[in-house]
Amino acid sequence: MEHKRMYYTLPATAWSKNDEKVGGEAAKAPWDFERTWMEGFPIGNGRLAAMVWGDEEIDRLTLNHEWLWKGQHKNRRSPDNAGHLGEVRELIRKGDWEEATRLGNLYFSGGTNADRRIDPYQPAGDLTFLPDQVKAFISRELDLETGLTTTLRETPEGTLKSEAFIDCEGNTLRCRFTSDAPFSGTLSLFREPEKDTTLTFHTTPETIRMDGSIAGGIQFAVQIWAETDGIAAVSEEGKLRIEGATILSIEGNMATSQADLGKELSHRSGKDFDAAFSSHSKRFSEMMNRLQLTLSEDPALEALTVDQRVQRVREGKQDNGLCQMYFDYGRYLLLSSSICGELPANLQGKWNNNMNPPWDCDFHFDINIEMNYWMAEPVNFPECVEPLTRYVLRFMESGRDSAERLYGCRGVYLPLQADAWAKATPEIFGWHTWIGGAPWISQSLWNHWLYSGDRAYLERIYPFLTAVAEFYEDYLVRDPDGTYQILPSQSPENFIVGLPYPVLLCQSSAMDVQLCYDALGYAISAAEELDVDSTRVSLWRSIREHLPPFRIGPDGRLLEWDREFPEAEPGHRHLSHLYGLYPSELFTPETRPEQYQAAIRSLDFRLSHGGGYTGWSRAWVACLKARIGDAEGFYEHFTALIKDFATSTLLDLHPPRVFQIDGNLGAVAAGIEALVGFYDGKAHLLPALPKEWAEKGSLKGVRLPGGHLLSFAWENGELTELSVTVGFGETVSLAFNGDVCTLHGRVGETVKLI
């Protein structure tokens, strides 16, 4: 089996017509739009995206542009409620959790003001081609190395081949339909009607243009250019009739009023399909091939389609080749949603077919957006971090304003949820009374510095890192004994027995203390590297040294809140208090062995009560299991993502059946962590290699802090090859089976150790 080629002999609609193929769930007739769309192939370059799907006869591409969001012109600003902070703090000090939570939610999480609510990411429309006659569906496939989809159908005259990709060089959508005999059909561009959106069309024999205007918001347009050796004629607005063609080549673009709509829309690559694909695939495949995971597998499975292999895994059978494909698919999805983008990947990457998508397809700062980029540095996709960096830095103005108006603090505040417009306004009653968004996302920015050593980048993010520290300077409350308390505080998104609100407000939750400790550390290290702000560094260091301890309960578990509370949901999907175990390295056997063991007990407790019941949560569990060296636990939860939380095309699912991309992307981070984990200043080789993968395998091109590139192979769990290409850090330490090797080399030098 080619692990970067996803091959199927059934169309996407098969999974909405056959109950057995969708886990026995009832399907709508004639087919379920939502379910069918999720069985398609996602293609994209970050700015543009499309889901390629359809039935036995029709090709359908659901189109997206990263800036097509509602709400652009809403006047959103946080309420001026800082004067109420003391009241909420006093209630928490007195132990009146319920009233403190009620008032905190009212004052600091948006209350009931829907005007500040974020608005949803929107689909741009659909492009379809319906041939006049199709005898049979033959196959469809997605090449993960190039991002090219290919579909074959049998017609009375011969074989009709359709291809599509989104060009990461030319920055347009490309489609081509070819046949060895003339074909005819209808090319259509349309969008589902919506009451607040006005659509107009302009159609010629060579072009289709659709313009849309969303009331009180953004304008957008989709432009299609069609070239054929047959006859093309306008059949009606938005539709072209194609007759007697052996080739139909399409180039498409999308634009919004976020930029210069006319200029953006008129852009074309200036190349034919083959030339465009050649330049695109060169860049795309270079990035996909920077890292290579190889696992031993059963060659007898190579003849099966991907959906057949997924079904085998659901039946409890082993399939290393499918694990390898799932790993590569996650890398493909991050690349396709980030490489040319200005915005980071949202909850669904850049793919959405719904006018009102779940959670608005927004950006969640309490795990999801961070998880999307956990793998970016180790898989050597540093370019993909740029859209995330741009997005975060755009919050500075609104984040400073909200910090002042909500809490009377300097510095920057980020809400739990946000949309494309980077407004730091809390909008959801309950969950949004949380100050941890800015410190958590600062970890992603800091990691890019650790892996790249780019001093200009560090100077660029330094104002944000210090603004986070500055917020803590003002927000923390000092006890008489000198301890700095985080007040109010919460542990996303958990609550306790008897509380009528979705999240508990307390003093110094475990996660908030961990985030504060790390964020102050980033500011300190950055200032020292840049040789600035020595006075502020002294203050930040003092605060860090006087934060509350990481508390352990009487049963040996790490306490989630500042004291032992009865959890309303012991198996809660969030693992917020385990941030210090992963993605942070606060808790390791070397640094804090007691908290490390307590965190493991907390993880086991949560799982024993049904935790990890969403795709992203299960991915986090897999990361945690890999970090603690639990090889079989890692394998169990990694494969559960395929078995229990994936469509037949391996897209991650949130119950009941909602696509969320974070599980796909988090799974890659887990796979990396199982094979090479970096903490305590060392790269730990094969720390959680499961027995199912132990026979033979290799990982080549994984990136480490310091910019080092590591490649190694193993047989029967023992290293057989090991080499390092030295990065800017010049020194790297490797650990395996209790032994540590420290290598000193010149930048760019490749040293073969085994």
Predicted regions and their residues:
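Alpha-helix N-cap/helix-initiation motif
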Residues: 35, 319, 361-362, 430-434, ...
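Acidic/histidine-rich catalytic neighborhood
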Residues: 467, 471-526
